[in-house]
Design a protein with these regions (language model features):
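Bacterial N-terminal signal peptides that target proteins for export
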Residues: 1-12
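Alpha-to-beta junction loops
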Residues: 81-82, 99-108, 150-151, 187-200, ...
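Acidic, polar ligand-binding/catalytic clefts
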Residues: 69, 73, 77, 82-146, ...
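Periplasmic-binding protein-like
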Residues: 49-50, 125-136, 198, 202-243, ...
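Extracytoplasmic small-molecule ligand-binding "clamshell" domains
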Residues: 26-109, 257
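C-terminal motif of bacterial Sec signal peptides marking the signal peptidase cleavage site
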Residues: 18-21
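Bilobed "Venus flytrap"/periplasmic-binding protein-like clamshell domains
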Residues: 47-52, 61-78, 132-184, 198-200, ...
Length: 267
């Protein structure tokens, strides 16, 4: 375990050094800010595997990366507190854990529905939404998706499930409990396409021969830091933290480290 911790800290050292430099120009967090952001004294970061926006394995050693993962460690370094990763199967479970106060931080789509359950800092990254299909799928273009008989997979409890459920007039949604199961359902032709952000879609496609991400998009995700409701005292600090990460170029470095594709520009 200690070896793994040393490897992780080594991989994140450039991030921590940049954060330390940024912190020199940012006021130190006061007691109220720390109480809001890390009430237990440890920053509990909620992640789920398979999405570069959350957590993926990168490099020959398979070290952990991803925006929620790396931003969480960067924030912990800025605050001067330890970080604990809390892993879930899918994003909906991360949001539920935030609502319950079981985790303190994640990075995810700041949708209108989620904003009713958690608080968001300003948007840091915009990401295109699209579809993944297998060779031989009856869906060859986005215009083919919402037709009778088409089965479109989504992550169970995701924003995509809610948005497409309202938009579709003909296609049927097929919820998948995890990204691994979504891959299997695509391979077994239990769905004709899978819908989510392109960061996830390209990751899935890399692991699935004879699959491709359709050209075009059906929308955008606005990705932002999320914290539990009732901790708004910490939001001004998160605003400055995000601004510093973007201005220093470190946010873009994290995007590249995670291998995140499909971005539509940062704000």
């Amino acid at each position: 375990m200690r070896i793994l911790q040393r490897l992780l800290l080594s991989a994140l050292l450039p991030i921590i050094l940049v954060v330390a430099g940024c912190a020199a120009t940012r006021p130190a967090p006061d007691a109220a800010t720390l109480a809001a952001l890390v009430p237990t004294g440890t920053l509990r970061v909620g992640v789920y595997p398979g999405s570069p926006t959350s957590m993926v394995l990168v490099g020959k050693t398979g070290e952990k990366a991803g925006l929620a993962h790396d931003l969480g460690f960067a924030l912990g370094a800025a605050l001067g507190v330890p970080v604990k990763l809390v892993e879930f199967s899918r994003v909906a479970q991360v949001i539920d854990a935030l609502k319950a106060g079981q985790v303190d931080f994640t990075f995810t789509n700041a949708s209108e529905s989620r904003a009713r359950d958690v608080d968001f800092a300003p948007t840091l990254v915009r990401l295109e939404l699209g579809y993944l299909v297998m060779q031989g799928s009856p869906i060859g273009a986005i215009s083919d998706v919402d037709k009778p008989g088409m089965r479109v997979g989504v992550s169970q409890g995701s924003t995509s499930q809610g948005v497409l459920g309202r938009q579709f007039k003909n296609a049927t949604l097929v919820p998948a409990p995890s990204l691994d199961l979504a891959q299997e359902m695509l391979r077994q032709q239990k769905m004709d396409a899978f819908a989510t952000n392109k960061g996830i879609l390209f990751e899935l496609s890399d692991a699935m021969p004879n699959s491709r991400v359709l050209q075009g998009r059906w929308g955008y995700e606005a990705l932002a830091i999320a914290i539990p409701k009732g901790r708004q005292t910490g939001l001004p600090y998160l605003l400055r933290f995000g601004q510093d990460m973007a201005a220093s170029g470190q946010l873009q470095s994290l995007v590249q480290r995670a291998g995140l594709r499909g971005t539509a520009g940062s704000e």
